[in-house]
């Protein structure tokens, strides 16, 4: 690789960057959906109470390119006001967790963030692995949000590209905690990856179907709340 340039025909072979907490309902289906095109990665988990940890350990035994990582701390979720009051230890923050997972992946390799409440289209993922031309390029993925209504029928509720699902080169990467208030005064807090390039280089079309409320089945009743 000279001056960060990639061969025009180079296909990236990324490591999966995965974090899990109580996502049994979609976990195995999500992991199986990436297997045709992603063969290695780190699957981190913490505070699992629904058996997700057992699924992960078994999946990694069956697919030895994937490594399990039990994060030994509780993590405050996105949106918590505790990020503003700064009463959290670093290891209990999202950025602390993400940085710990990142340390388990080799440097100077490509990584793709995988969320296990999504079912992926492997052919679209594979196409995206040919897109980057330099190690500074960033691929940003979009997804189709779906929800179950009170009749247990699936409904499409949005097509989004939120910027939190990416393919990047693991050089000088790290995460920070971000918090503040929007124009309406609503509080927000989340983790943010720090990249050299501010805008995505490539934006392939829908790479996955996202089931954002499968963790909490009670929240599936009520499309009007979206």
Show the residue positions of the predicted features.
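N-proximal low-complexity "stem/linker" segments adjacent to membrane-targeting elements
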Residues: 1-32
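A short acidic, amphipathic alpha-helical/loop segment
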Residues: 29-33, 55, 126-128
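Short beta-strand-to-loop acidic/aromatic patch adjacent to the donor-nucleotide binding site
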Residues: 108-119
């Amino acid at each position: 690789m000279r001056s960060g340039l990639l061969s025009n025909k180079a296909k990236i072979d990324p490591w999966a960057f995965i974090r899990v907490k109580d996502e049994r309902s979609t976990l195995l289906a999500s992991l199986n959906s990436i297997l045709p095109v992603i063969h290695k990665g780190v699957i981190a988990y913490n505070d699992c109470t629904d058996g997700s940890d057992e699924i992960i350990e078994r999946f990694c035994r069956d697919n030895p390119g994937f490594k399990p990582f039990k994060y030994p701390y509780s993590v405050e979720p996105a949106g918590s006001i505790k990020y503003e009051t700064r009463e959290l230890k670093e290891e209990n923050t999202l950025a602390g967790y993400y940085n710990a997972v990142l340390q388990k992946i080799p440097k100077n390799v490509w990584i793709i963030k995988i969320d296990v409440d999504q079912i992926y289209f492997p052919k679209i993922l594979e196409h995206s692995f040919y897109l980057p031309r330099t190690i500074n390029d960033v691929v940003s993925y979009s997804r189709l949000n779906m929800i179950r209504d009170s009749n247990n029928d699936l409904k499409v509720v949005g097509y989004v590209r939120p910027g939190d699902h990416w393919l990047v080169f693991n050089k000088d990467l790290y995460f920070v905690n971000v918090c503040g208030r929007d124009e309406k005064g609503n509080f927000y807090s989340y983790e943010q990856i720090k990249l050299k390039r501010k805008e995505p280089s490539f934006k392939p079309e829908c790479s996955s179907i996202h089931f954002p409320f499968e963790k909490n089945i009670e929240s599936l009743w009520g499309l009007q709340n979206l």
